[in-house]
């Protein structure tokens, strides 16, 4: 069994929901082969462009938020994670404001998030599993219709797609045919979010 963890966006995560996810993983440990976070593990609020020149940029909580992630990742027994728009904020912020830090290993996302120490595999291009690919969901345009962002990514990649990003849960097929005969069906699955709002 593969467990997909939706966007946590720590510190905005729903603590009860995350606790229930941790319990589920513990209860089914023997059956689970992978636990994959779908990106946006941290919100990186202080690094966001909307926070620039506002009090949000000066909260000095990023280290604490990262430490919360480490604890949650351990409890969830995360094995893999993929890139996402919120986790991109670290490199983007450094590139825009402090480019001299770009070659500092501690500020590279996998190291900052503690992935090597947690034995978590980092997949910056998404994670391919058989005829599925796990993507964050921001790789192309988004749709307001649940499941449709993932379905469009399925059409684009030619693979079944599971994604986060849009904060909706949905499962939508994309079926092709020729001469009245079905040739294939691809699935787009959006996994929702784990935020407390």
Region spans (language model):
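Active-site neighborhood of phospho(di)ester-bond hydrolases with catalytic His/Asp-centered motifs
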Residues: 4-6, 34-40, 80-85, 134-137, ...
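A general structural motif
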Residues: 30-33, 76-78, 130, 157-158
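Short acidic-hydrophobic surface loop/beta-edge motif
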Residues: 124-130, 173-176
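Short amphipathic alpha-helical segments
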Residues: 17, 49-50, 93-95, 147, ...
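Conserved beta-sheet core of the metallophosphoesterase superfamily
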Residues: 138-197
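N-terminal active-site segment of His-dependent metallophosphoesterases
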Residues: 1-70
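Active-site neighborhood of divalent metal-dependent phosphoester bond hydrolases
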Residues: 44-124
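Beta-strand-turn-beta hairpins that frame and shape the catalytic cleft
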Residues: 1-3, 126-133
């Amino acid at each position: 069994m593969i467990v997909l963890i939706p966007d946590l966006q720590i510190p905005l995560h729903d603590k009860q929901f995350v606790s229930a996810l941790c319990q589920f993983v513990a209860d089914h440990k023997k059956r689970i082969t992978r636990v994959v976070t779908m990106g946006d593990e941290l919100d990186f609020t202080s690094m966001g462009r909307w926070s620039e020149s506002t009090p949000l940029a000066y909260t000095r909580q990023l280290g604490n938020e990262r430490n919360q992630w480490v604890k949650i990742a351990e409890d969830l027994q995360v094995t893999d994670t993929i890139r996402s728009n919120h986790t991109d904020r670290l490199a983007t912020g450094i590139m825009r404001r402090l480019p001299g830090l770009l070659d500092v290993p501690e500020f590279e996302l996998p190291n900052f998030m503690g992935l090597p120490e947690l034995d978590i595999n980092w997949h910056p291009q998404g994670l391919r599993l058989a005829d599925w690919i796990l993507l964050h969901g921001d790789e192309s345009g988004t749709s307001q219709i649940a499941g449709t962002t993932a379905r469009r990514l399925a059409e684009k990649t030619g693979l079944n797609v599971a994604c986060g990003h849009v904060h909706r849960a949905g499962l939508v097929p994309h079926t092709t045919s020729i001469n009245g005969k079905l040739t294939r069906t691809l699935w787009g699955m959006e996994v929702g979010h784990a935020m407390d709002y």
